[in-house]
């Protein structure tokens, strides 16, 4: 039994994000580590973290949520997430969900991700499902084929 066994999964995930949070300027054009995220693998239950990296040119940006998912994929070849938390200097409170690009990424990565829980309020443990953030998603037809 580990010390983390006494913490709920959201506390474990939040603690994991804190290790990644240390905003820094990589160059005069690029910032990193000012948004952090953790995903829990639906396959193994392991927690994977990521941090954002943003440049002056928007096409180079990588959100923390997608970096966490890519870390999961690199480690276990899996893109199905059970849970997601993203934050800055404090735990999520009163909302805060992944951007549209991240929502779309998770929807396209695996049909099962529509059931992914996204923490919107750490204090109350309030969550929302990804499918509720993208009702009537355009890609449903492809998955049903």
Label the predicted regions.
Residues 46-47:
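Hydrophobic "anchor" residues
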Residues 63, 67, 101-104:
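Short amphipathic alpha-helical face segments that pack within enzyme cores
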Residues 35-36, 60, 94-96:
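Gly/Ser-rich catalytic serine loop of serine hydrolases
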Residues 1-30, 75-145:
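C-terminal binding/interaction regions
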Residues 30-42:
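Short beta-strand scaffold segments in enzyme catalytic cores
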Residues 51-66:
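Compact, glycine-rich, soluble single-domain proteins
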